[in-house]
Amino acid sequence: MLVRIVAVMLLLSAGIVAEAMSHSFVCKASGRLGGPIRFEFYRNSSTHPKTDIESFTVSIRTADDRWKTMWSIFSHRGLTEPIEYGVTPPGFTTMIKPQKLIPGHVYAGFASDGHGGSSKVTFGFDKDGTMIFLDNPLD
């Protein structure tokens, strides 16, 4: 019985530590088709830029409600400026080459800082190429 109590306490402690180590941050997307599409990252508001991004992926929502990677980059160095779609920042490595973004589809930008932090922005483009933002469909 004592072993079970200790095991449960250890599991609860591990869960609390894991929750404390994970956190989210803000990812803002801007731009339009035919022009630059930029992604900026902030700690908790638009006043404190976050530069310790280690990975960034843009994915498309498929017809069977899954995500397919359209572009993916990785680094251990961090950012000095916003990420522009299809342009690999200095110090980053392209894992998957960028594919063309088209109107009428749902996309998501996923970012990780390498120490438990993550962010996601869901977006699309209307017929004239204007970026529109979506409320995380089918998550």
What are these regions (language model features)?
Residues 98-104:
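Surface-exposed, short loops/turns at beta-strand junctions within beta-sandwich domains
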Residues 59-96:
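Extended, solvent-exposed segments with strong compositional bias
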Residues 113-120:
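Short acidic/polar inter-strand loop motif in beta-rich domains
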Residues 105-109:
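Short beta-strand segments enriched for Tyr within beta-sheet-rich domains
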Residues 17-64, 120-139:
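N-terminal non-catalytic regions of secreted/periplasmic and cell-surface proteins
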Residues 5-14:
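Sec-dependent N-terminal signal peptides
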